[in-house]
Amino acid sequence: MNFTLIVCTYMRPIPLLDLLNSVKSQTIYPNEILIIDGSTNNETEAILENNKFQNLQYFEVPNEHRGLTKQRNYGIARVGDITDVICFLDDDTILEPTYFEEIINTFHYDDEIVGVAGVAINEMRWIKKETNKKYSKYQFYEFEGYVYPEGARNILRNILGLQSNLGPGRMPEFSNGRTCGFPLNEKIYEVDLLIGMSFSFRKVVFDNIKFSHYFEGYGLYEDADFSIRAQQFGKNVITTKAKLLHYHDPSGRPNQYQYGKMVVRNGWYVWRVKYPNPSLKAKFKWNVIVILLTFIRFSNIFTTSKRQEAFTETMGRIVGWLSLSFNKPKR
């Protein structure tokens, strides 16, 4: 099975080099590596000139193609005809040596699988369940012999009956599912949502759909939107055998006010892609959760040192929510 790796990057030459060095150590190597660079300087190009990698092609995108969503589509348009699978990785990730081998093995495992994602092992918070210990159903999520300590927002959702009754990676009718991922148990799980830091799809998916123009710019939740639309062609899964490290880099994020608006408006958009006509109960829950999460973010004004960020994001969330009454996002 031939596969292409696409990395969309912006002003991160050193993290990109670290990623590519981890690609070089893979047990199976990509047939193509496309670097889609939206940087406004030549540092990334220079570092790739000084560090050669097999099968790598570098593309400096023009200004009109900058931004994650546009760069993804730009890369897809340049994939070779022999490719069966297109893999995307964030430029701030580092792979375990068998990452690609496990991704490709998962596609071989079931022809109905069209999307596969791995897991970031440095973000794992799952712990083995102790046999004789009782865990609060409000403070812990129990799953297949493991427990996951809930954060403040999920504890409140548990208490208020606003938690999803579906497994991780699944989107309930009111949209807000569990984001805890899966324990490292070497299993494969079917999901609705794959995370853009590490997802791969069969090329047939890209022959039919592309990343949505709605998310051009920062692209918050564009991966969720694409994952949902990809399900018309087959199943999405997460394999806990495909492991990587993810080092979140905050650069490139819009100001907190705009980010707060995006959280609500883009969240509404993705919800309606999956559920165009949700029930009245689901609508009620979605709105209550928006209010709850906005209140929690507002409380950060008094509980964290980054008070200005908390205040402006809260305002963005409020404005984003109110705007839905007269200006809903359009597909």
Residue ranges, per PLM feature:
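A short, conserved alpha-helix in the catalytic core of glycosyltransferases
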Residues: 185-186, 192-209, 216-242
